[in-house]
C-alpha cells in the first residue's frame, strides 16, 4: 500500500505525469467540466471533501509555480479567497519559490480548464471555489 500523501490513484497518477507549465484544476461541485478533459470526481456529498482539503493534499505533492482564479471569488467568496491566498503564501515558503497569482473572468476560467491535464471535482458548494494550478519544476 502506498504511504505517501495522495492515496487516490487517479490524482497521484496525474500529478506524477505533470510537466513544466502543465495545469491541474481543483474545482467546486458546480463547475462544468469539458468532455475533453479528464475528470477526477471525488465529491461524496455537499462539502465533502472541501475545496481546501483537496488543494492542501494536491499541493503537498505538486510543485506549483502559478495559480489562476476567477476574479469573482474576491467579491462572492472573500473568506475562501483569503484562505486560499494564505495557503499559497505558505506553499511559496515551503517550496522556496514565488507563486504567481493571476485572475480572469469566470467565463474565461471555464475555457482554460479545457487545456488542463485533469479537473479534480471536490464536494465544495460555495461560489467560485476553483483554482487552476500551474506545475513548476523542483530544480
UniProtKB/Swiss-Prot annotation:
Superkingdom as given in the UniProt entry: Bacteria
Binding annotation for substrate: 28, 106, 128-130
GO cellular component term, pick one: cytosol
Pfam family, one: RbsD_FucU
Keywords linked to the UniProt accession: Carbohydrate metabolism, Cytoplasm, Isomerase
Location of the active site: 20 (proton donor)
Subcellular location: Cytoplasm
EC number: 5.4.99.62
UniProt similarity note: Belongs to the RbsD / FucU family. RbsD subfamily.
Complex formation: Homodecamer.
Protein name: D-ribose pyranase
Amino acid at each position: 500500500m502506498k504511504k505517501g500523501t495522495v492515496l487516490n490513484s487517479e490524482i497521484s497518477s496525474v500529478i506524477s505525469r505533470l510537466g513544466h507549465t502543465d495545469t491541474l484544476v481543483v474545482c467546486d461541485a458546480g463547475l462544468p467540466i469539458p468532455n475533453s478533459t479528464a475528470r477526477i470526481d471525488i465529491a461524496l456529498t455537499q462539502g465533502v471533501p472541501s475545496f481546501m482539503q483537496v488543494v492542501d493534499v494536491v499541493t503537498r505533492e505538486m510543485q506549483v509555480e502559478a495559480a489562476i482564479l476567477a476574479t469573482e471569488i474576491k467579491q462572492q467568496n472573500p473568506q475562501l479567497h483569503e484562505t486560499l491566498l494564505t495557503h499559497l503564501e505558505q506553499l511559496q515558503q515551503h517550496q522556496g519559490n514565488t507563486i504567481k497569482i493571476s485572475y480572469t473572468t469566470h467565463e474565461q476560467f471555464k475555457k482554460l480548464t479545457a487545456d488542463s491535464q485533469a479537473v479534480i471535482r471536490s464536494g465544495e458548494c460555495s461560489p467560485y471555489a476553483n483554482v487552476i494550478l500551474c506545475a513548476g519544476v523542483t530544480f
